[in-house]
Amino acid sequence: MTGRRLSTLLASVTAAAAGASLLTGCGVLPGATGGSREPVTVMTWAPDQTRATNMPGMPAMAQTYARWVNSQGGIDGHELRVLTCNEQNTPTGAAACARRAVREKAVAVVGSYSQNGRAFMAPLEAAGIPYIGGYGITEDEFTSPLSYPVNGGLAALLAGHGMQLAADCGTVSLVRPDTLAGDRLPKLLDAGLKKASKRGAVDIPAVEDATEYTTQATRARNKAGTADGCVAAVLGERTQTFFDSFRRLPESAGGAEADDSGSDSDSGSDAGREPIRISSVLGSVGQPVIDRTGGTRSPFEGAYVTGWYPEADDKSWESMRKVVKEHAFADNRVDPTDTGVQTTWIAYTVLKQVIESLDADTVTSARITQALDHGARVETGGLTPPLRWMYEDLLGAPDFPRIVNHAVTFQVVRKGRLVAQKPGFVDVGPTLTNRG
């Protein structure tokens, strides 16, 4: 760890300790007693009510899961107690949630979302607490020996998205956050595009929490050109805002900028222009966004979308939908079509099967970690390939060594629903390991 990284992390942790009493949105879900075995305490965190990405459905799904398993006697006789915490989309908030997990003696952090990996992983590593099934948004989730990811994160999504777009797109404009994490995205998308001998995407950084994106939308359209052009946006919750700006662009682009060769990239007239295809990845565009923006009349109709899991209407989600229907108690935060909710469900599936494999009266973080490191195999009912985190299962890709699930799905919006464009999973492992 560099001195700069260490000092930054220490500053975050110190600030978290000082501000812990101000943390809001934390709670614990009591449940029915699970029998004579000791309760198991875990934590799920996510940002809520912030100006950027919010994931309130993830802690809500964790609480729903606890109500379900506790109504059936707990996990292998253990009552499941779920702590929740608002990560606030800040390093201080993330570190505070992690330190709370340590204080409350959580044996794992499960199915959580944070963009502040450096801030939360250090406290967890110091306490030996495993991080199971994080959303996959940070580098630390794929490098820390105590992280057990259930998907391939943004790396898999972007590489897969490049592969999906390569079949139909000539030039691709990528609109992505102007952040350190966002700086990685163009190379990942290009890895997928170049697998099909396509040139790299035009990189268009954008402020993550902007209220409109007219400038970036204009540039993206101009750069995509008129023949087989595609515009991909990966801006989290602000993706909808971007495509709203994109949809509102005038038919004539007028003052088009020059392209990289110095020639005019748009004649200023859209006569005969073929519609530019739009695209994104799950987490930036999903069924809830499509529903909110008009369903069959949504601007996302026809969009290509790359995901980690099967489409929301797939029968493999039946068990989750049943649990949500019976135990979410009309909590509208728990949307079974939301990618965050789905990730939390899969993460708790991992936790449940690992605890059951222990067959112990007391469950500790060390026992969970040992089980995961020594070959605990988790079946998710077709939501992912079988999951296991032994050394030989790790992809070992540069920057993302702990990826074990390098499968993605290709989807498309048809008649207002996300449906499979291509059946089954697509393996992006070779693309990630061989990228330049």
Residue ranges of each PLM-predicted region?
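Beta-alpha junction/loop-to-helix N-cap segments that form part of ligand/metal-binding clefts
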Residues: 4, 37, 54-60, 73-142, ...
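C-terminal motif of bacterial Sec signal peptides marking the signal peptidase cleavage site
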Residues: 22-25
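Extracytoplasmic "Venus flytrap"
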Residues: 28-65, 72, 87-92, 178-182, ...
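Ligand-binding clamshell of periplasmic/extracellular solute-binding protein-like
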Residues: 57-61, 106-121, 134-142, 232-240, ...
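Periplasmic-binding protein-like
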Residues: 101-114, 132-134, 172-176, 224-242, ...
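Extracellular/periplasmic Venus flytrap/periplasmic-binding protein
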Residues: 145-270
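Extracellular/periplasmic periplasmic-binding protein-like sensory domains
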Residues: 248-345, 428-429
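Segments of small-molecule ligand-sensing domains
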Residues: 331-341, 352-418
